[in-house]
Amino acid sequence: SVTVEMLMENFQKYKVLLTQNQNFRKLFAARLITLGGDWLLTVPLLGIIYELTENPFITSLVLVVQSAPLFLLGSFGGYLADRFDRKKIIAISEFLSGMTVLFILYAVTTENVIFILFSFGLLSVVGSPYMPTSDAALPNVVKKENLAEANVIFFSSWGVMAGLGAGLGGYLTTVISRNMLFAIDSLTFVLSALIVFSIKKNLSEKNEDKNKEEDISYKEGLQYAASKKEIFSLIITKATFSISASGLLSLFTVLSYDIYKTGDFGTGLMFGARGVGALIGPIAIRYFFGRTDGKLLNTIGITIMAWGLFYFFIPFS
């Protein structure tokens, strides 16, 4: 049938990107490792804060300090990616992230909740240039006709590692100590930087290829986003959704510790299940409902409502 043929054609495009494009494969692998490093920390930190405070609200701040800097500084990371060597930006960001993980390890030993939250927020601050820089480098390693599929793979990477990283983080805390997990995690960021540096192709756009009209300041970029209703609405939607999600997802830890008595392992399983959904969702939505950007925009409100509805049923499980 036509549907099966289209499905096989799309699958073939994804397969070619992952098996025949070495530069893309390396950039994607580095992204997976970095996201995995972030999520390895999240589950044990949620458990640590909840053990110290037994307060769901304070526990939710772990996810707030993780996501807020990415939202606030992400556009600045894009600004840096347009003006400086992208490999160097990634290397500096990853090196600082690895050092910050060791700083988090020290903060945990103090059992000072504010200090722990501050150190975890600092990890998001120093790591904030990585994602926009990695995104900006994508057209440098992928042909224009394959860019749509590459974007789907790239943005589904969050779901892959939210599942694998969080699940693995929860499991590893039952095998090794949390402190050992933090020490190992610091090395993942170094590994990611090394992989990116092994990419032979230049990841930075050449200045002569850029249109002068595109060379705008960071302030002008913010003003442009604020002046465009569609862009501004998407930014507000993303920000408010992240805030509400942080409060809700922190309850995974409360459920795992107080109801199911499964500790970090149970929290990791729940975050892992969420990650599987986040992996399947973008691919399924694009295939069935959003073949164009306009159609994709129309699915945002419906999917957010569906997200809330499904989480509504968790207390009845």
What is each stretch, according to the model?
Residues R25-V43, L63-Y79, D85-M99, F115-T174, ...:
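Substrate-agnostic recognition of the 12-TM MFS/MFS-like secondary transporter fold
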